[in-house]
């Protein structure tokens, strides 16, 4: 046993365990205890999710406790909804929301794009959650923008765009060039079938029967849009042609809302030439108004220059319900 000399000249016995190396440090030099950066980030995300769940449970408990108290919550009206938007990208804030040491806010997406640097003061941001603002966002309930047209749905402020995409009361515009009629999908169909609807001289339009092919002409020199009205239901199908550097692109869309409940339409399209035919099949996409420019996400039929003879050519179309493509 080790001994140590004291001030009085006597030796004291020391516990040998004090001089033993800790067993839990074995392998430290070999790097066995080094944490992988990706694993650390995953653990951090899991901790954040657990914190969110615990926070929601605490909020529910608090709400239950407060429900029995005489003081009840009251709705609050904001003068401007801008305070609920990310000050950097101006999009609605949603959890997780972060703040820098100076109190500036940013959404999770902006934190990543700016490499965790505050866009206002350049301080670090992306580690400190702003729980208070997250509670405000979750409690912010707004009516649908189409409430005045009959929609009774309400959503949180950060999720209103998701509802707008599938709202059946969304405004649909008549595709006829000289008509300014805007209303719901059902009203638009009634409008197209009524005698009050007037087709202009420059508007190219045809009646259309489901499952029955129809030949029509397109003339890029005069009009790049052809409108078909389905004979029974009154659905409006819009065929548009867009000139490109490498030929012409043709799209087929339907004026309708995106809400579930209406049957999908499929389209079989053919470009007719004297010695050859170009065919294409796709689902008919729903839009709310005629587009002035081509969208790359649309299903397109590409017609190469060698199949074009001037601005006037002949095409054939067949519309069917569901995923049904008819060879034409």
Curated annotation (Swiss-Prot):
Composition bias, Polar residues: 63-77
Zinc finger regions, RING-type: 86-122
Biological process, per Gene Ontology: protein ubiquitination
Pathway connected to this protein: Protein modification; protein ubiquitination
Ranges annotated as biased composition (Acidic residues): 10-20, 27-62
Binding annotation for Zn(2+) 1: 144, 151, 163, 167
Residues bound to Zn(2+) 2: 174, 179, 191, 197
MF term (GO), any: zinc ion binding
UniProt keywords, alphabetically: Metal-binding, Transferase, Ubl conjugation pathway, Zinc, Zinc-finger
Notes on the domains: The RING-type zinc finger domain is essential for ubiquitin ligase activity. The SBD domain (substrate-binding domain) mediates the homodimerization and the interaction with substrate proteins. It is related to the TRAF family.
Function: E3 ubiquitin-protein ligase that mediates ubiquitination and subsequent proteasomal degradation of target proteins. E3 ubiquitin ligases accept ubiquitin from an E2 ubiquitin-conjugating enzyme in the form of a thioester and then directly transfers the ubiquitin to targeted substrates. It probably triggers the ubiquitin-mediated degradation of different substrates.
Designated name of the protein: E3 ubiquitin-protein ligase SINA-like 5
UniProt organism field: Arabidopsis thaliana
């Amino acid at each position: 046993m080790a001994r140590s000399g004291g001030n009085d000249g006597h030796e004291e016995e020391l516990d040998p365990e004090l001089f033993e190396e800790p067993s839990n440090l074995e392998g430290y030099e070999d790097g066995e205890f080094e944490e992988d950066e990706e694993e650390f980030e995953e653990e951090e995300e899991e901790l954040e999710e657990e914190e969110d769940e615990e926070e929601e449970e605490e909020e529910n408990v608090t709400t239950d406790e407060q429900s029995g108290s005489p003081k009840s919550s009251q709705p609050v009206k904001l003068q401007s909804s801008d305070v609920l938007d990310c000050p950097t990208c101006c999009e609605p804030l949603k959890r997780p929301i972060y703040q820098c040491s100076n109190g500036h806010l940013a959404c999770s997406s902006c934190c990543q794009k700016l490499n965790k640097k505050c866009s206002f003061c350049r301080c670090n941001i992306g580690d400190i959650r702003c729980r208070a603002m997250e509670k405000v966002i979750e409690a912010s309930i707004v009516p649908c923008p189409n409430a005045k047209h009959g929609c009774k749905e309400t959503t949180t402020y950060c999720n209103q765009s998701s509802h707008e995409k599938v709202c059946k009361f969304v405004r649909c515009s008549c595709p006829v060039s000289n008509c300014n009629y805007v209303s719901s999908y059902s009203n638009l169909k009634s409008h197209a079938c009524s005698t009050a609807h007037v087709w202009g001289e420059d508007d190219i339009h045809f009646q259309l029967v489901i499952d029955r092919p129809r030949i029509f002409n397109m003339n890029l020199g005069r009009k790049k849009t052809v409108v078909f009205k389905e004979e029974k239901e009154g659905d409006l199908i819009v065929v548009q042609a867009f000139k490109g550097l490498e030929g012409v692109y043709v799209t087929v869309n339907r004026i309708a809302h995106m809400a579930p409940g209406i049957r999908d339409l499929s389209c079989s399209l053919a470009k007719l030439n004297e010695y050859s035919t170009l065919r294409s099949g796709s689902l008919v996409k729903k839009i709310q108004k005629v587009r002035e420019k081509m969208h790359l996400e649309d299903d397109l039929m590409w017609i190469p220059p060698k199949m074009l003879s001037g601005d006037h050519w002949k095409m054939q179309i067949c519309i069917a319900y569901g995923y049904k493509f008819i060879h034409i």
